[in-house]
Amino acid sequence: MTERRALTILFADVSGSTRLFETRGDEAARHLVGSILIALAEVAARHGGRVVKTIGDEIMCTFPGPLHGLLAATDMQRRIKHDAGFQLDNLAIRVGLHHGEALVENGDVFGDAVNTAARMADKTLARRDQ
């Protein structure tokens, strides 16, 4: 059943993962990227978020409101910056979020709000120096 709902959509992408696979090898890089995605999912859950899916080195989450998503995005950046295991490889994340009407169907989310959030993440510059 398809339901229309106002949601905040968040995408977080691991910046530098291509280089990581080249320098660390497939298994080590996949393990590290997986650890980062788990950390991001934990942060999302603390802010009332739900992980919709992971796509390679990216996580897609929904939140009940904009403030939940914004606080999660801030804490995600903080978590990556302050985790020594993630900083060994100078990793960062790019986060994009948008609030709007979305279609929820079989646990997945579709619509313009989703596309806008994905574009925001794509256009964001990863900051490793903050």
Residue spans of the language-model regions?
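Catalytic beta-strand-to-alpha-helix segment of the class III nucleotidyl cyclase homology domain
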Residues: 60-130
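Catalytic NTP-binding/metal-coordinating core of nucleotidyl cyclase/transferase enzymes
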Residues: 1-71, 79
